[in-house]
Amino acid sequence: MPEGPEIRRAADNLEAAIKGKPLTDVWFAFPQLKTYQSQLIGQHVTHVGTRGKALLTHFSNDLTLYSHNQLYGVWRVVDTGEEPQTTRVLRVKLQTADKTILLYSASDIEMLRPEQLTTHPFLQRVGPDVLDPNLTPEVVKERLLSPRFRNRQFAGLLLDQAFLAGLGNYLRVEILWQVGLTGNHKAKDLNAAQLDALAHALLEIPRFSYATRGQVDENKHHGALFRFKVFHRDGELCERCGGIIEKTTLSSRPFYWCPGCQH
């Protein structure tokens, strides 16, 4: 599943294609959304936001399209009039004079009014977004030490969107390697230096993944163009200590780590 940086890049691409342009055609596959088609003709997208792995397309009439790609959903940008050759099932079409954005295969799609943005079950449940520039290491540290999260092993905590939105498996692996911790550690057991390092890494690594999308590198995952230190590198040498990177399973997901320097 794409993680926060990849969802944010998808949002950037959608914004670049149609933001501010009047919608000339709107189509939704799901019957409960059909009524909104005519309401959106002539309106425009004001911005495309993200909350973790959810994408929020905001319109000029104050409606917001909520979509979560889950495992299979994917957005495409095409020239208006172009029909992509695909076996995927079309769910959403937002068309302007020159560009059209298409959502395929996703099933978690809703239209929200302003007051629903604070009451929607997923949006209520997720924690602060790691790509939110207003989120600071100090706030992350407070969350790590809160009664809700301080006793949880990082193996599961760093996959829990209620803790921080936008994290996923490759980020979990890379963050824990960066700070020399394992998936079995808990925030309550860390010293001040470890806690500080983790709080910074939880923000810096996702933001670095997002920001370095233009760099060329062979180690790619869902378009994250930054160099993996351990993810998908089992059997290779750890660049920090020279140990052998291992692969195991933690919280039902593949986990990569170096026993030589993560302990």
UniProtKB/Swiss-Prot annotation:
SUPFAM superfamilies: Glucocorticoid receptor-like (DNA-binding domain), N-terminal domain of MutM-like DNA repair proteins, S13-like H2TH domain. GO terms for biological process: base-excision repair. It catalyses: 2'-deoxyribonucleotide-(2'-deoxyribose 5'-phosphate)-2'-deoxyribonucleotide-DNA = a 3'-end 2'-deoxyribonucleotide-(2,3-dehydro-2,3-deoxyribose 5'-phosphate)-DNA + a 5'-end 5'-phospho-2'-deoxyribonucleoside-DNA + H(+). Binds 1 zinc ion per subunit. The keyword Hydrolase applies. Signal peptide: none annotated. Its EC number is 3.2.2.-, 4.2.99.18. The keyword Kinase does not apply. DNA binds at Q70, R125, N169. Its cofactor is Zn(2+). InterPro entries: DNA_glyclase/AP_lyase_DNA-bd (IPR015886), DNA_glyclase_Znf_dom_DNA_BS (IPR015887), EcNei-like_N (IPR044091), Endonuclease-VIII (IPR023713), FPG_cat (IPR012319), MutM-like_N-ter (IPR035937), Ribosomal_uS13-like_H2TH (IPR010979), Znf_DNA_glyclase/AP_lyase (IPR000214). A zinc finger (FPG-type) spans 229-263. The active site is at P2, E3, K53, R253. It comes from the Bacteria. Keywords: DNA damage, DNA repair, DNA-binding, Glycosidase, Hydrolase, Lyase, Metal-binding, Multifunctional enzyme, Zinc, Zinc-finger. One of its GO terms (molecular function) is zinc ion binding. Belongs to the FPG family. Involved in base excision repair of DNA damaged by oxidation or by mutagenic agents. Acts as a DNA glycosylase that recognizes and removes damaged bases. Has a preference for oxidized pyrimidines, such as thymine glycol, 5,6-dihydrouracil and 5,6-dihydrothymine. Has AP (apurinic/apyrimidinic) lyase activity and introduces nicks in the DNA strand. Cleaves the DNA backbone by beta-delta elimination to generate a single-strand break at the site of the removed base with both 3'- and 5'-phosphates. This is Endonuclease 8.
